[in-house]
Swiss-Prot record:
Ranges of residues in domain EF-hand: 64-98, 99-134, 135-170, 171-206
UniProt keyword list: Calcium, Metal-binding, Repeat
Binding site residues for Ca(2+) 1: E118, D123
Protein name (record): EF-hand protein 5 variant 2
Residues the record lists as binding Ca(2+) 2: D148, T152, Y154
Entry text on domains: This protein has four EF-hand domains, two of which may be functional calcium-binding sites.
Keyword rRNA-binding: no
GO cellular component assignments: myosin II complex
Positions of disulphide bridges: none
GO molecular function: calcium ion binding
Region annotated Disordered, chain positions: 1-35
Length: 208
């Protein structure tokens, strides 16, 4: 499983999802300026992420900054239309209804009607990485399917430990114990309800 699940939006593009590779002359300036402005928020989010994930990396910030630049029409704008962000999310596989999209805007603090039409880079970053968390949940659940051949909804403690020990970012023994605690498993349990585990992780992330 590729833990990041990030959406790469590169080069010249319109909002129909057709992207071409390439760098922009203002890209580097945009990255550094916006990254500095969101450092504190990112550090806070990193502390609250599930143990199998690392903090948001510079690469993720760079990719999101490039996407923001593309949606701004190639100009260094402070805000972009939220409707363009919604269209982009639809075209890169983040299938939300309009109601779900507006719910997500409320979660990131865009609850006021006068603010809902435009997003700053910080809002864009929070929104896109939040949706990545949902993609992560699907990827993690799919990883459990590898062990649950008969789709019972359960894996053994050994299989659970093996899964997290073989991920790209291997969990330490201490982290595995914490993950087992999230799964509400004690030493006498051998079966783990992985759907409940994934849902609990998702719930914790969404409460950030």
């Amino acid at each position: 499983m590729q833990a990041r699940g990030t959406v790469k939006v590169q080069g010249d593009a319109n909002v129909d999802g057709k992207m071409s590779t390439g760098q922009h002359p203002h890209h580097q300036h945009l990255n550094s300026t916006q990254a500095n402005a969101t450092t504190t928020a990112l550090e806070y989010r990193a502390m609250n992420r599930p143990l199998y994930r690392g903090p948001i990396s510079h690469n993720i910030i760079s990719e999101m900054a490039e996407g923001f630049y593309v949606l701004s029409g190639g100009y260094k704008k402070l805000f972009i239309p939220s409707k363009d962000v919604y269209a982009l999310m639809q075209n890169v596989g983040m299938h939300l209804t309009e109601e779900e999209f507006h719910d997500a805007l409320r979660v990131i603090g865009q609850s006021e009607p006068q603010n809902a039409d435009e997003l700053s880079f910080s809002d864009f970053l929070l929104l896109m990485t939040r949706e990545v968390d949902d993609t992560m949940a699907d990827e993690l659940r799919s990883a459990f399917f590898h062990y649950d051949k008969h789709k019972t909804g359960y894996v053994t403690r050994k299989q659970f430990t093996e899964l997290f020990a073989t991920l790209a970012e291997r969990s330490t023994p201490e982290e595995l114990e914490e993950l087992l605690a999230v799964a509400e498993v004690d030493e006498t349990d051998d079966k783990i309800d992985y759907n409940r585990f994934v849902n609990e992780l998702t719930s914790r992330v969404n409460c950030m």
